[in-house]
Curated annotation (Swiss-Prot):
The organism of origin for this protein: Staphylococcus haemolyticus (strain JCSC1435)
Pathway of action: One-carbon metabolism; tetrahydrofolate interconversion; Amino-acid biosynthesis; glycine biosynthesis; glycine from L-serine: step 1/1
EC number: 2.1.2.1
Binding site for (6S)-5,6,7,8-tetrahydrofolate: 117, 121-123
InterPro entries per the UniProt record, alphabetical: PyrdxlP-dep_Trfase, PyrdxlP-dep_Trfase_major, PyrdxlP-dep_Trfase_small, Ser_HO-MeTrfase, Ser_HO-MeTrfase-like, Ser_HO-MeTrfase_PLP_BS, SHMT-like_dom
Keywords of this entry: Amino-acid biosynthesis, Cytoplasm, One-carbon metabolism, Pyridoxal phosphate, Transferase
Cofactor(s) listed: pyridoxal 5'-phosphate
Role according to the record: Catalyzes the reversible interconversion of serine and glycine with tetrahydrofolate (THF) serving as the one-carbon carrier. This reaction serves as the major source of one-carbon groups required for the biosynthesis of purines, thymidylate, methionine, and other important biomolecules. Also exhibits THF-independent aldolase activity toward beta-hydroxyamino acids, producing glycine and aldehydes, via a retro-aldol mechanism.
Recorded superkingdom: Bacteria
Record-given protein name: Serine hydroxymethyltransferase
Enzyme class: transferase
Record-stated family: Belongs to the SHMT family.
Catalytic reaction annotation: (6R)-5,10-methylene-5,6,7,8-tetrahydrofolate + glycine + H2O = (6S)-5,6,7,8-tetrahydrofolate + L-serine
Amino acid sequence: MSYIQNQDKAVYEAIQNEYNRQNNNIELIASENFVSEAVMEAQGSVMTNKYAEGYPGRRYYGGCDYVDVTETIAIERAKALFGAEHVNVQPHSGSQANMAVYLVALEMGDTVLGMNLSHGGHLTHGSPVNFSGKFYNFVDYGVDKETEKIDYEVVRQLAHEHKPKLIVAGTSAYSRQLDFKKFKEIADEVGAKLMVDMAHIAGLVAAGLHPNPVEHADFVTTTTHKTLRGPRGGLILCKEEYKKDIDKTIFPGIQGGPLEHVIAAKAVAFGEALEQDFKVYQEQVIKNAKVLSQTLQEEGFRIVSGGTDNHLLSVDVKNSVNVTGKEAEATLDSIGITCNKNTIPFDQEKAFVTSGIRLGTPTATTRGFDEEAFKEVGRIISLALKNPNNDTKLKEARERVSRLTAKYPLYE
């Protein structure tokens, strides 16, 4: 960091402050993770200098020999991780990966079946404020009011009623396994294609701890961060028959030059995910999520759907301790625990207020937190949210957070 320190003290100070925040706080945002130093080094390498429109072996610029090498490595490693016939590693984000699939599979105004955002879906699955909801006719499916789990018979009924051209299976705040085989059966019944957005669970899928959607879906999209623990970016996996359409939709359709420094970092992350240690890590992520869920339930908190099968859980704080998600987020932030307010199914609060918070275990697990540590995290959360105006209790909670972060330092 010495170059930045000497040249731009304001940016250097902000970066150092962010490092201190990450090191001294417990990160529980489910969509975040800590990349390895090798991934960071690749992303900060000379690959950032190279413009490389096109694909390996077919570039519109000279001097692409070595970015061809790293991009090809990324492609082959992603294929090996997920068993995909074709992979495009160029999407700058998960949203752009989703956009590319929509442009291939749909015409403007076509009907699509996607999960309701407030029930655990994603903005790009048809939210009216997102391009997906503006360009296409999305029909929502959600969770059952009693079980708070997806009712596949309701999904089937909606599919038969609305005859979508595409069904989107994927979530951003759903703590249960998705039945991709059942989604595919429903899609086939109505002649729809199936797209799976596995952004949140890609690491679990890569480790063999969640069913793999690749064998069922026509298209699979994901981010490369979150549980996959790579740089921020996107990825598309598809059947060979869609290769040409997907590739030309990414470039030149919606992107120009790929971010080859990010692709190099993706290659490194995919290599890490192929190691046995990665499976051990993902197993711990799930164990920690289950322990956190159980601890909070023992403390009197209601967990949406009653628990978790993956890396995250949604906590109904409004009906547990009578604070909103917004208030809970602020209280936890004040003691050094970072999370995000989140709507829960059938939420009566506005989206910027919410009745819930979403908690995820990947980031803290990366720095070494085990089940005992997450039991303590659950107790600290309970202490703070039950005493949001008690300075003595909040001071105690902050001190307990500091003991945990000191025990499991970041990047050492």
